[in-house]
Amino acid sequence: MAVSARSARTSPGSDKVQKDKAELISGPRQDSLMGKLLGFEWTDLSSWRRLVTLLNRPTDPASLAVFRFLFGFLMVLDIPQERGLSSLDRKYLDGLDVCRFPLLDALRPLPLDWMYLVYTIMFLGALGMMLGLCYRISCVLFLLPYWYVFLLDKTSWNNHSYLYGLLAFQLTFMDANHYWSVDGLLNARRRNAHVPLWNYAVLRGQIFIVYFIAGVKKLDADWVEGYSMEYLSRHWLFSPFKLLLSEELTSLLVVHWGGLLLDLSAGFLLFFDASRSIGLFFVSYFHCMNSQLFSIGMFSYVMLASSPLFCSPEWPRKLVSYCPQRLQELLPLKAAPQPSVSCVYKRSRGKSGQKPGLRHQLGAAFTLLYLLEQLFLPYSHFLTQGYNNWTNGLYGYSWDMMVHSRSHQHVKITYRDGRTGELGYLNPGVFTQSRRWKDHADMLKQYATCLSRLLPKYNVTEPQIYFDIWVSINDRFQQRIFDPRVDIVQAAWSPFQRTSWVQPLLMDLSPWRAKLQEIKSSLDNHTEVVFIADFPGLHLENFVSEDLGNTSIQLLQGEVTVELVAEQKNQTLREGEKMQLPAGEYHKVYTTSPSPSCYMYVYVNTTELALEQDLAYLQELKEKVENGSETGPLPPELQPLLEGEVKGGPEPTPLVQTFLRRQQRLQEIERRRNTPFHERFFRFLLRKLYVFRRSFLMTCISLRNLILGRPSLEQLAQEVTYANLRPFEQVGELSPSNMDSSHSNPPESNPDPVHSEF
């Protein structure tokens, strides 16, 4: 860019002439109140031609180009990380029996080496977008692979990944290469040329919609009452607020109400000149916090990069003017921009104004239609009813960020052989690489269909698949989300019709949450509780582990019958009644009332409690020996308590070994907690370096395979082993390359129903 900067350097007087000329061709200054507030007059909206002229008004390209550069740079960083280039071989390894969840069943991943080629094209597109090199082609090279990878896996969908695709789509049609770009160096007509106002209008409108719709979604009662992110206030980032407020008030006032007000107001604060500095401060603080609170990749930084779009478009030129003269030679141009055919210029000093052409009208139409579509999509749930579960709409484009938190207590997958009638049970998540299928009917249907294709390999013919999934959303009762009596393989599902086998969320029981919190707070530290709600006519089969020596069930509402399977005994419970449950046995809880039943399991993990007491005794004994209050010699099997490790002699007891492992773990946690900042930062850089190193090496291996053919398996194994090395990290660091993420285990056929335990 330095060549472009030097070639346009002019004297201060010449800069002033160019600026005056640009002001003349852009039209008169807006002196009315509306013009000062919004940047346009009512007359600009009085006809289609005037609106087209407004949206194609010549605008400084500087701010748009800076956003293009930052967005492209962040996508370059995103592709090896959240897009998964560094772990692509574990996700798309050829020959894996894996159930996948594309938007359309016809979408299939390419062979592994070709998937690396797809990611390479996407990476080069992001790099070209950042540099402004063959800009339009680079945008397309990034955009097409990005949406292909995005649509290939619904389990990875989220709001910010969807937003990246939208921003790349918008940039494809914009003139973001008219400033600080390689294209500008090579083409004098593009270099430092105006861009039409609609380029900024679309981007600003998109960011405004993200903030505002997210705020509207947070008007949900669960968010306003503080149930959505109840535990977030425990994070150390909220410690300053807890100097004045309790943890509960910090959660309600700061996390929930503060987040609601910020989302509703951020777009307005950024839009108006008078409030922009306040808006920039709060959204910057907000996104910096989010980058530490959540694993959301580049989202916080993309939003930070988008904030300056609301500032005056020429702000980069003003920033450059404050830099030393020598440094300015390496920075973007500060000269006034030149005219562009993409813009419509008004009358200036006796000259007639320019008539808008087809390209100008298409730009204006694109702006209006795109923003209207973005306002409509978050509320289009009545069209895509098949994707409506307890929350409405396709996940990822509704901007309902962090409004719903879920916990899964119990997941059981039952298969029945269609010919023999034999029952069996599958490990939850077998043949998948994600856990997200548990909450969405469309993915559950895809999972069941996939299992019906795979199970015949394990001598299960014409399999029927049943799911019993218990979920709590925003601290409600645990309840079934799908009907466990329905064979999902044969169940009907359509994207445009309501799914009949989705159980309704028991909203009538929401007021119970305050009472449930009271019950939790009244229990001691060793007592746990699980709250259950079930539908009439259904039953829960459960197993009480032998570790849970003191387990009881108490009815809160409705009526249930508890069957003790081994004892062949039934007992009916009514509101307020409870009974003890034997450990190591199965029981069934039938809802016999005409309305949903509510009950709770109260239990103590007696094995864990005894272990904690024994470990506390060993810790106390160790401290007594160290401070001299314990004068008697320790038995040989307890000597490792003082030495911190086993150094020969009698084999320590399992309890002592557990104590030593616990001490080592606590020491490691303390060491990491007290690590200086520069060491933490260095370790962070090493982890990122490994991600990029592995991405590069595995990509080179795959591209070599495509060009020259695959070598022997022994050579491939050596190359992959080398790619997995962490030469920059200390020995003992956990390598994700050694972690198996496929979970492609065969089903467990077991005549005895072994389920997940509460």
UniProtKB/Swiss-Prot annotation:
What highest taxon heads this organism's lineage?
Answer: Eukaryota
The way it spans or sits in the membrane comes to: Multi-pass membrane protein
Q: Which GO terms describe its molecular function?
A: gamma-glutamyl carboxylase activity; vitamin binding
Root EC class: lyase
Q: Which Pfam families match?
A: HTTM, VKGC_lumenal_dom
Q: Which residues carry this modification: N-acetylalanine?
A: 2
Q: Which residues lie on this side of the membrane: Lumenal?
A: 82-113, 158-292, 383-758
Here the segments flagged for biased composition (Polar residues) are 735-747
Question: Which E.C. number(s) belong to this protein?
Answer: 4.1.1.90
Disulfide bonds, paired cysteine numbers: 99-450
Q: Where in the cell is it found?
A: Endoplasmic reticulum membrane
The record's listing under SUPFAM superfamilies reads:
RmlC-like cupins (SSF51182)
Q: Its family? A: Belongs to the vitamin K-dependent gamma-carboxylase family.
Matching PANTHER family, A to Z?
A: VITAMIN K-DEPENDENT GAMMA-CARBOXYLASE (PTHR12639:SF6)
This chain's function reads: Mediates the vitamin K-dependent carboxylation of glutamate residues to calcium-binding gamma-carboxyglutamate (Gla) residues with the concomitant conversion of the reduced hydroquinone form of vitamin K to vitamin K epoxide. Catalyzes gamma-carboxylation of various proteins, such as blood coagulation factors (F2, F7, F9 and F10), osteocalcin (BGLAP) or matrix Gla protein (MGP).
- More details: The vitamin K-dependent protein substrates of carboxylase have usually a propeptide that binds to a high-affinity site on the carboxylase. CO(2), O(2) and reduced vitamin K are cosubstrates.
Q: What is this protein called?
A: Vitamin K-dependent gamma-carboxylase
Q: Which organism is it from?
A: Pongo abelii (Sumatran orangutan)
